[in-house]
Curated annotation (Swiss-Prot):
Domain named S4 RNA-binding: residues: 37-99
Pfam families per the UniProt record, alphabetical: Ribosomal_S4e (PF00900), RS4NT (PF08071), S4 (PF01479)
Family matches, as InterPro entries: Rib_uL2_dom2, Ribosomal_eS4, Ribosomal_eS4_central_region, Ribosomal_eS4_central_sf, Ribosomal_eS4_KOW, Ribosomal_eS4_N, S4_RNA-bd, S4_RNA-bd_sf
Family of the protein in this entry: Belongs to the eukaryotic ribosomal protein eS4 family.
Gene: rps4e
Keyword rRNA-binding: yes
Alphabetical UniProt keywords: Ribonucleoprotein, Ribosomal protein, RNA-binding, rRNA-binding
Organism of origin: Metallosphaera sedula (strain ATCC 51363 / DSM 5348 / JCM 9185 / NBRC 15509 / TH2)
GO biological process terms, semicolon-separated: translation
Disulfide pattern: none
SMART domains per record: S4
Protein name from the UniProt record: Small ribosomal subunit protein eS4
């Protein structure tokens, strides 16, 4: 199905329910329908880079828009958390980050920052040859050699800093006190601050532990560990506001 009614569309999309009956349905891809923005709508409704969907389709089909360093020609392609969008001919570079009001929003970044992204490790799988496969939140998979013993020990939900599109691991950020974290889901999505403590329970798995985030104004917020993402140690590694 190419389109859905605006009433059926994810609640956070910037789409007037009174202007048109139909809107774009995101294609199957690295992000689920309920956590992504179709690329064509991003250009028109979020960036005002185009004035119509037809214009968005033309620019995208001409190969002028890159997502995570690769040309995407599908105007329905789903972009989601921490994806990097580049429109080089317009000198425009963006990152998709959580938004307190609308779940997701684009923020402008520098060309230098567009060369890498942060992504969470969702799970690990042993594959043929004794290699370890990292399955990441944006749908990509990384093969880790047997010699990388420290990588084998990484817990799930660890944040990896990777180059794009080459997928070289540039940094690893785990959960510990005073690292910078961002709430990426739940009612506090978009909150950014330092991790003050993790409250665990013997009756729940690790991912349902409670993370306490202290924002710059001193307020404290709680969210599940699975709704939190480490974005840096001494400072955020990426621009998120």
């Amino acid at each position: 199905m190419t389109h859905i009614t605006r009433l059926e569309a994810p609640w956070f999309l910037r789409a007037s329910k009174k202007e048109y009956k139909w809107t774009v349905r995101a294609s199957p891809g690295p992000h689920p329908l309920g956590k992504s923005i179709p690329l064509g709508l991003l250009l028109r409704d979020y960036l005002a880079f185009t004035s119509s969907l037809k214009e968005s389709k033309k620019i995208i089909s001409d190969g002028k828009v890159l997502v995570d360093g690769r040309v995407r020609r599908d105007y329905k392609y789903p972009v989601g958390l921490m994806d990097v969008i580049a429109i080089p001919h317009a000198d425009l570079y963006l990152r998709i980050v959580p938004d307190r009001a609308r779940l997701l929003k684009p923020v402008k970044i520098s060309e230098e920052e567009s060369k890498f992204k942060l992504v969470r490790l969702l799970n690990k799988t042993l594959v043929k040859g004794g290699l370890l496969q990292f399955n990441l939140e944006d749908g990509r998979n990384l093969l880790i050699s047997k010699e990388s013993t420290e990588m084998f020990k990484l817990p799930t939900l660890t944040t990896l800093k990777i180059s794009i599109p080459n997928q070289e691991i540039l940094g690893v950020y785990g959960f510990k006190e005073n690292v910078y974290v961002m709430a990426v889901g739940g009612k506090n999505a978009g909150i950014i601050g330092q991790l003050k403590r993790i409250q665990t329970s013997p009756y729940k798995t690790r991912r349902y532990s409670i993370v306490v985030i202290r924002s710059p104004d001193g307020s404290e917020y709680e969210t599940n560990l699975e709704n939190a993402m480490v974005i840096g140690e001494e400072k955020p590694e990426v621009k998120v506001e």
